[in-house]
Amino acid sequence: MAKLRPYYEESQSAYDISDDFFALFLDPTWVYTCAYFERDDMTLEEAQLAKVDLALDKLNLEPGMTLLDVGCGWGGALVRAVEKYDVNVIGLTLSRNHYERSKDRLAAIGTQRRAEARLQGWEEFEENVDRIVSFEAFDAFKKERYLTFFERSYDILPDDGRMLLHSLFTYDRRWLHEQGIALTMSDLRFLKFLRESIFPGGELPSEPDIVDNAQAAGFTIEHVQLLQQHYARTLDAWAANLQAARERAIAVQSEEVYNNFMHYLTGCAERFRRGLINVAQFTMTK
């Protein structure tokens, strides 16, 4: 099996900004992905837990199973999986800050289940697991690795294995034109800004990039649930939280970082509302 090296540097430059900065706009779950506002009156924390539950419920988890979280962030889904679903968990991350906080949070649970975070990429992971979940990590992968990711995921799952991929994706110009959605120079500059200043090396997949490669690896796409407007609302909440903590944010990082993040959060919210970007949970079965 060819050895692929994870892109540690890109992930660490994106996420190893001070945790104190992210704490200013994230909720207590420390989940940095699209929330699911199942009810209009939900707080951001409630909606983040609802999103994690929405994903984990689709995996048909049973107590004692082992769940792999690819790109586990600060461990929010890992903690939820152990506490609510009574499973063993392994979280993979390329970010040292994510790894340290995830490790500490799992150690504080006091479970008899195996619960670990690893500073490791999926490219280096070869153990068998029962289920796989991944929240918005796929859109940081390189297109040339999409098929390999799905093939390796397929290989480490049992015959009744299930994977839940929660990912952003974008559309090609032709589809946008057919839908009457204009792609402007401002949009192109914004995407360039995201790649250079917020998510170095990031490249949004298309829906066919996800579906076609997953099917080529052997997966069946059982269900796709779109969450586009939920992300617009999530981004609004993050932007409001960060704006309210402007002085502290600048003190913790810098005015440039604060301005970049406000531009990113508000700009993404606008583009989700216009339909340029989408996000979905793809339920895959072996």
Curated annotation (Swiss-Prot):
**Domain of life of the organism in this record?**
Bacteria
Task: Please give the SUPFAM superfamilies that the UniProt record associates with this protein.
Answer: S-adenosyl-L-methionine-dependent methyltransferases
Gene Ontology annotations of biological process type: lipid biosynthetic process; methylation; mycolic acid biosynthetic process
Pfam families per the UniProt record, alphabetical: CMAS
Q: What happens when the gene is disrupted?
A: Disruption of this gene suppresses trans cyclopropanated mycolate without accumulation of trans-unsaturated oxygenated mycolates and shows an increased ability to form cords, thus establishing MmaA1 as a negative regulator of cording in M.tuberculosis.
Q: Which residues form the active site?
A: C268
CDD domains linked to this entry: AdoMet_MTases
Q: Which UniProt keywords apply?
A: Lipid biosynthesis, Lipid metabolism, Methyltransferase, S-adenosyl-L-methionine, Transferase
What pathway or pathways are given for this protein in its record? Lipid metabolism; mycolic acid biosynthesis
Which Enzyme Commission number(s) are on file for it? 2.1.1.-
Q: Name one GO molecular function term.
A: cis-trans isomerase activity
- Binding locations of S-adenosyl-L-methionine: Y32, T33, G71, C72, G73, T93, L94, S95, R96, N97, H98, W122, E123
Q: Return the similarity comment.
A: Belongs to the CFA/CMAS family.
The entry's function note states: Involved in the conversion of a cis-olefin into a trans-olefin with concomitant introduction of an allylic methyl branch at the proximal position of the precursor to both the methoxy and ketomycolic acids. It directly affects the cis- to trans ratio and indirectly affects the keto to methoxy ratio.
Remarks, anything else?
Answer: Was identified as a high-confidence drug target.
This chain belongs to which protein, by name?
A: Mycolic acid methyltransferase MmaA1
